[in-house]
Design a protein with these regions (language model features):
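Flexible "stalk/tail and boundary" regions
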Residues: 1-12, 17-20, 27-94, 101-150
Length: 150
């Protein structure tokens, strides 16, 4: 059934003083179905959030990089931006990840984190920042569009 293999929905969970936050159980099941031992986390390129994905993301990233001309600035920038910042994390027996200080600072997380499902990957946001980003996206989607005339 489609959907069970994707990161869907939105969850807000507390971050404890040790930087631990619970990964949504549905998402741990998605990662397990993908035979991902843990989760990859890195600073999102275009958003003030943490990007997350299963290990299968690396193959997708490599395909995207390989499609770019060798030696091109775009290819090099993509490699230099993403590859060094990707880290593998595993959750504990209670389904919690320990976020490192760099990721917490990048996303400006404090006591809570909002997990946002985006299909093949997810992001972890400061709740207030996500509310603004979500509202902007919904406003653009709902904006009247010019319809073709016949």
């Amino acid at each position: 059934m489609r959907g069970l293999d994707q990161f869907l929905s939105t969850f807000t969970n507390r971050i404890d003083k040790k930087g631990r936050v619970s990964v949504p159980a549905d998402w741990r099941a998605v990662l397990a179905a993908r035979q991902s031992v843990g989760v990859l986390l890195f600073p999102a390129v275009y958003e003030p959030a943490i990007q997350g994905a299963g290990q299968d993301y690396l193959a997708e990233l490599d395909r995207d990089i390989d499609a770019l001309p060798r030696g091109s600035a775009e290819r090099d920038d993509l490699i230099y931006t993403l590859k060094p910042s990707i880290r593998a994390f595993q959750w504990d027996s209670e389904g919690r990840l320990v976020l490192n200080d760099d990721l917490i600072a990048y996303a400006k997380l404090d006591e809570v984190a909002t997990f946002v499902g985006l299909g093949q990957w997810f992001q972890i946001w400061r709740p207030e920042a996500w509310a603004v980003r979500e509202a902007e996206a919904k406003q653009r989607v709902r904006a009247p569009r010019a319809r073709p005339t016949t």
